Amino acid sequence: LVLWIDVLMGEMNFTDFTDFGYVSEDSLWGGLTKEAHRGYMTRCLELAERGWGRVSPNPMVGAVLVRGGEVVAEGWHAYFGGAHAERMLFEGLGDVGDLSDCILYVSLEPCAHFGKTPPCANLILGKGVGKVVVGVLDPNPMVSGRGVALLRAAGVTVLEGVLEEECRHLNWSFWVNQVLGRTAVVAKWAETADGFMGFVKDERVLISGEESGLWVHNLRAGVDAILVGVNTWNIDRPKLNVRGIEVSKQPIRIVLDRNGRGEYTSEGLSRSEGELWVVGGDLNLSELLKWFYEAQGLGVILLEGGASILQSFVDADCVDDIHILRNSQMKLGAGIKSPNLDRAILKRDQDFGADEHWIWQRDFGGIGSGTEEGERAE
């Protein structure tokens, strides 16, 4: 027997990690090392990403079944309302005999409640899988540890927290939905090196480059709706759609038009560009986002301007993910200033040509980080 020893608050807690080979870097279980476990979870994340833009407001999930260091089957949640990752995996498994010697890796805790599909935890038990590795626990109050508890109660060995941060990050918008009870918000804008988004007068200026444009369309492909203010709608006549990337449906276009000043032509109303919602009246942004999520099922929306709309969401603490494309080679000298926020929170990501990419994302800390009694990867 090999024990993992934790010393906390003056007490020693002993947890048996022998079954999973998590005692030391070179320990083995079934020929698998820590890095092997992480490698299979990385594959789960790769599979999960295939649901990008297709499963919202559900989370993206991937699953891999391994026997003796070999992948037996894979699955992922492919579209909203469709089979969950675990069910897809088992449906494509074929006859491979007893599964008690297999490890099932899944990026998100198996569900334990009836939704559009039956509980995956029950399915796993019915298949007789002996061991399960979970990336991160589900923040959904209807799950939130119940899935792994159900598995453990039936004698399945469960390990939590393999690539936990990566698994949580993949579905950051789902965490917003479940923890804050509202639609998640991505804010994206382009700015010049001297901090301007455009001219004051009603004319367009192209700030970001072609490489950024390709990235923006991939970002749009992953959201449920794109929101702009009425000034941006009237002046820029934006298409607010996805181009150059195959999508199952175009994002909904939302215009915030408090006083009915929008110019809605037949071209703008074309459904081929996506549904158009015009939202007017005295708006409370927090309540609006709750309505978007609870009544309309929008998991995540993208803010694309203008500056006053972006600033209002920032000031209301209703932005969860920020992407700034800063053209380092362009200055306007005057014009519409970029939203005011604490730039110290931003981190530089991969640049696109001359465009610097600065990002920030809301931190949910340890939410979904594991049960107190659970065996965890370190």
Language-model segments: residues:
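Zn2+-dependent cytidine deaminase-like catalytic core
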Residues: 65-166, 252, 312-314
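Short secondary-structure transition/capping segments
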Residues: 144-148, 170-174, 238-241, 334-336
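N-terminal pre-triad scaffold of radical SAM enzymes
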Residues: 102-112, 180-191
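Proteins enriched for Cys/Gly/acidic motifs involved in redox and nucleic-acid/cofactor modification
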Residues: 54-55, 82, 148, 162-190
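Helix-turn-helix
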Residues: 62
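Short, low-complexity, charge-dense intrinsically disordered segments
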Residues: 1-6, 13-23
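Enzymes that bind and transform nitrogen-containing heteroaromatic metabolites
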Residues: 10, 21-59, 74, 93-94, ...
